[in-house]
Structure formats: C-alpha cells, structure tokens
Amino acid sequence: MKILEIYDKQIAEKEGNIFIFISKWIISVDHKNIGTMYTNFSILAGIVGTLLSLVIRMELSTGNMLDGDGQQYNVIVTAHGLIMIFFVVMPAMLGGFANWFIPIMVGSPDVAFPRLNNISLWLIIVSFFLLLTSSCVGIGVGTGWTVYPPLSTMEYHPGHAVDVGILSLHIAGASSLLGAINFLTTVFNMKIAGLSWSKVSLFVWSILITAVLLVLSLPVLAGGLTMLITDRNFETTFFDPIGGGDPILYQHLFWFFGHPEVYILILPGFGLVSIILSKYSNKGIFGVKGMISAMSAIGFLGFLVWAHHMYTVGLDVDTRAYFTAATMIIAIPTGIKIFSWLATLWGGVIKITTPMLFVIGFLVLFTIGGLTGVVLANGGLDISLHDTYYVVAHFHYVLSMGAIFAIFAGYYYYYSIMNSTRLFGVVRYNEQLGRIHFWTMFIGVNVTFFPMHFLGLAGMPRRIGDYPDAYIGWNLIASYGSLITAFGLLFFVVNIFTPYIRRSVNIKNGAIILMGLDFARDWQIGFQDPATPIMEGIIDLHNYIFFYLIVVAVFIGWVMGRILWRFSYKWSYPTIGDIEIFKNFTAYNQIIHGTVIEIVWTLIPTVILYLIAIPSFTLLYAMDEIINPTVTIKIIGHQWYWSYEYGDNASNLIEFDSYMVYERDLAEGQLRLLEVDNAMVVPVKTHIRLIITSGDVLHSWAIPSFGIKVDAVPGRLNQIGLYVKREGTFYGQCSELCGVDHGFMPIKVQAVKLGEYFSKLNEK
C-alpha cells in the first residue's frame, strides 16, 4: 500500500506540471490518451452542432429569427451538417472508440503508427476551426454540405469563405485517411498470433470495413474538391458548361464518396451495438459469420448506389432503374443484421441498463430509418420526395438516431474504462441520470423528426428558411421536439462531469407545456391532392410499399416487445418452455450458429423487395414516356425568378418571367411565399412536354400535385411529360439552393381548358 500511496502522490504532483500535461496530452502517442482527446473533441463539436440545429429549428418555428436572411440560414445549415458528419460522428467512432479499443481487441500494445495517430488528431482539430472560420469569412459558406457548383463557384460565392471551407474538408479528409491506414495496418500486421479472423470482435470487423471504405472513397472527394477550387481560383472549367464542363460531374464525384460516407458513419455503430447487445443479453451474437458477411456486403454495395441521390438531375431511365434495384438490395444485408440482433436477444437474460436502452432505441429508430430508405430508393417515388423534408427525416433517423444513439450506448458502456484514472479512481456514470437522458432524448428526436415525414409528403422543400403557412403546424411540433432533445442532452453533460466534481445532483420535477396548435389548410399527413396520372401512380405505389413495410415494422416491434417482456432481468424470467429448444443440440446449433434460419430471414426481405420492385419499375418507365405532345413549354430557372417560353396556336413564341409577390403586396386571400406575378398556364387533358434548364445555378422545378420534380441544370435540357387531369391552381417551389440570399422561387400553375389556355396566352 505504501508504494501505491507514493505513486498516487507523484501522479497528483505531475498533474499540475505543465510540461507533463503537454507530454501526456498535446504530443501524446498513447492510443488511449488520443482516443480520449478524440472523444472529448467530438463532445465539444457536438455541442456546437446541436446549438446550430436549435437555431435552425427556432428559425423554422418563427421565420423571423434571422430577419429573413436566407444566406445566413444556409450558412448555419451548412456548418451544422459538416460539423455533425466530419467532426462529431467520425471522430467519436473512428477516433475515440477505435483508437481506444482496436489495439486492445487485437492484442497489440498500440496502433501501428503512433505519431501518425497524433497528427491525425491535430489535423481534425485544425480542420474544425477552419470550418468555423469559413462561416465567418465574408458571406460565409451557404452552399449546403454538398458544396454543389455553380453555386459554390466564385461568381455566386465570391470571397474566400468557400476556399477556406474546401481547405477544411481537405484537412479533415487527410486526417481520416491517415487514421484509416493506421487501423488497417494495425489489424493486419499486429493481430496477436492465435486470434483467428472468425474470433475477431465484430467491432474490429466494422472498423476494418470502414477503413477500407475511407481509403477508397476519400481520394475521390479530394479530387472533386480540388477541381472545384481550381475552377474558383485558376479559371479551369471542370464544372462550368461554358468551358465544356458539367456541374453534374461534381455530383457524381461527391456522391461516390458521399454514400459510402453514410456507411462509414454507421458501420462502427453496428460493431458497438453487437458488443453491448451480447453483454447485456448474456449470449453470444447470433450468426457471427453472417454478421461479418452482411457488413462486408453493405460496404461493397455502398460503392454501387451513389446516383440514387441524383434521380432528378436528368439520368437515363435505365440508369435510374439500375440504381433503384441496387439500392433496394442493400436492405437485405441490413435486414440480416436486424434479425440477427433480435435472435441474440431471444432466449437471453436481458439486463436493462443505460447502454442497453440506447441499443434498443437504436434498433427501433434505425429500423424506421431503413424502411423509409426503401421508399426513397424507388426512382419513381423519389421524384416526388427528393429534396423534401421526407429525406431530412430519413437520414436523421439513420444518423441522428442511429449513429448518435450507438455513440451514446458505447460511451456509457465504456465510460468507466475510458475515464478512470489513478487520480480520480474508478468513475461511474449515474444510472438514473442516464435513463432520464435516454427517455427525454428518445421522445425528443421522435417529436422532432417524425413530423418531417408528413412535411415531405406534403411537398415542403428543404434548405429554405421560410415556408408557406400551410406547413406551420408540423414545424412547430418539430421545434418543440428539438427543445426536448436539447433538454435531454443536458442530463448527459451533467452525468459525465458529475463523477469528477463529486457533487450530488438533485433532479426536480418539471413540466413542458405545449401550446395549442392551429393547423393551416389541409396539408397534414399525406400527399397533396393528385392532378396527374403520374401523381396518382406515385400515391398508389407509396401506399403499396408501405403496406409491406408496416407489416415488417409491426413484426419486428412485436418480436422486440415479446423479447423484452419475457427475457428482461428483473422484469420477468425465462420459462422452461423458452429454453426447451436448447435441450436439442441440432436446434441449439441452428439458433446460435446455424445457417438455415439465416437463409430464411435472408429470403424474407428478398421476397418483399421483389414484390415492391415490380410496380416500382412499372411506374418508373411510365414516368419517362412522353406521348405525342401537342404543347411544348421551356422552363428556365434564374436566381429570383422563372422564365417560361412556349408557342400559341399561331406558332408565335411567347416569353414571360414569373417573380414571387412579396408579402407586403399580397391581396386579401393570397398565399404568402406562393403567389407570383405571372402564373404558368397549361391546358388540361393535353399531353405536354416540359423542357427544363437553368441560366445560372442549379434549380429544381417541383409541383407536388403533379408528382414532378426536375432539376434545372446549366448546360442541360431535361425533359418530362405532363398530363393534367383537372382544372385548378397548383403551387410549388424551387427546392435547391438557388443563390446567395436569393428570394423564394415559387411556382404557380393554372390548369385550364384548351380554349381558355390559348386566350390566356394571347393576353400575355
């Protein structure tokens, strides 16, 4: 004991020594210290990103917080997206947990390149501050996290803000690439002798596959960003149609990285979930080889589906059909993982702790996000839902609730290991605070993001800081949900610091009062009323797909509820009947390791996807047909307005512009952000060809009731057929980032009889 007391005294003295502090933290090459610094950095960045998200939700709840400054809103949205992806999830997963536990799990004393590990950490920190700087330089980076040209070119984003942002992403990419190379080398070259690949932890496998994805995808992003920065500063024209370039090339390069990036964010979470699930169900993971194969398949297929983010840019229908099929196939290995986790729970003795609660929350919410992903995979349905809040809801269920819940589960699970020291002793989180954190956050994120599905179905475009009054109800509810989520995160912050300050925390009862909401108009929980056969087909296909997805969701929910009811420690106990199957060795082997049951639940999603695919392809090819058009209308997108060109019955070319009517000029009964000075006119029950292009940046011509959403791309002529079945006035909006501080670009279409159509043209 005397030796330990002397050691503790020396440790206490060293903690106050600045040189020892620098040696331990600033220039440390110890993988544990670096992992701790990564984790603390991701918590700090997460606080910044969460505060930005609260600003977004407050703006969307009032519309006046930023005084109508669309560029400032887009700068905040861009910073929020980039921070949460590159500086929260990736540092926590790959920098924090991977650095801490990969060497331990493979029996290595440290990572292969400790100094490379240190520089990787400091590169990501430098990158983070560069990103924050880019938001404050000039007009900021208001391009969205995708940084699409032409909006990101010097013409539309002058100054150095975008250049600094690109430099930040380059440095962050270099940091991730160095880390990936380090982990690959560590696992392959430093794995302890006798540890077979089949016995390597699923977390190690997940990091290994993630590292491969990083090595293969990041150079493509770096190439695209380098081409963009040379377009901005050195007069190259990689993405400028005037010089023979194509802005769609950038989208291909970006999404070839961007979609594997989704799996880079979520795969380490799969590994953490597997570890925690096995621990607190007191069982080995069901079908380990199947789980490894599923993760490998997800990683491989992730490189083959990037263009499902680009269904509206004018891709050939056969190309869209391929990406639809390839994207839906990813649901099969993902389904295998969900079913394998459920099989792990079945028959175990489940202990409900804070990490286990977050894992169960992960399973529920990730499943919902995956099911909506099957909807968006359809090239036909996505035409209506692309760039709406349905997409926002989908990827937040996968990332904000999937990856983030996995991070919280892992942090609570490894909290004592990662934070205990000789100075502070063994530190433990407060279980009650952890549970309060889970339930408030679980409720908060669902209240925030679930209503966004309804906003998307009704056609609310994303990336816009204000919106027609019809959408105010669900936006208010989502904003209340964000406050509940932030309130829950306070319990997390208190919980992780309480063990150090060693003070008791008294939790007082409180209440949140929700004001009565007055829902405007009738755009609430479904699509707008269809006006074309295409929109009717979209609604029918959506309902058809949802029938199968709801069946799957109900089945998974029933199984999970049954498991928690029958096998939870202290809730109930397994009965003799529950464990009867384990008396039979063959049956036991099938439940624990067998392939027969895996084949069965591989076939289940395969059959469901096949049943979904047939009507999906039918609708997709029907949408591509343009049947003997008698009217052709050319639509040109500009910043602030739309231009329309079409001929009358005497073949005279008629041109006019369509600007939004500002709120101060609206007549009584007119709709804010939807009225225009010159409405587009189309004849009913007539086949029409629409030719859509852009005169400056990317735009999106979208009418929810028509089931039409087509990108207007500079240098390209995208066309689509239109057949309006009924008379009426129909509204839409541009759903792309259409310029720096651009005005809203509403679309108003009047569908009239053919005779009245020509009369209105003559008036114009």
Swiss-Prot record:
It is found in: Mitochondrion inner membrane. SUPFAM superfamilies: Cupredoxins, Cytochrome c oxidase subunit I-like, Cytochrome c oxidase subunit II-like, transmembrane region. The chain crosses the membrane at residues 36-56, 82-102, 121-141, 164-184, 202-222, 253-273, 285-305, 329-349, 356-376, 390-410, 438-458, 477-497, 545-565, 594-614. Keywords: Calcium, Copper, Electron transport, Heme, Iron, Magnesium, Membrane, Metal-binding, Mitochondrion, Mitochondrion inner membrane, Respiratory chain, Translocase, Transmembrane, Transmembrane helix, Transport. Heme a3 binds at residue 394. In the N-terminal section; belongs to the heme-copper respiratory oxidase family. This is Cytochrome c oxidase subunit 1+2. It comes from Dictyostelium discoideum.
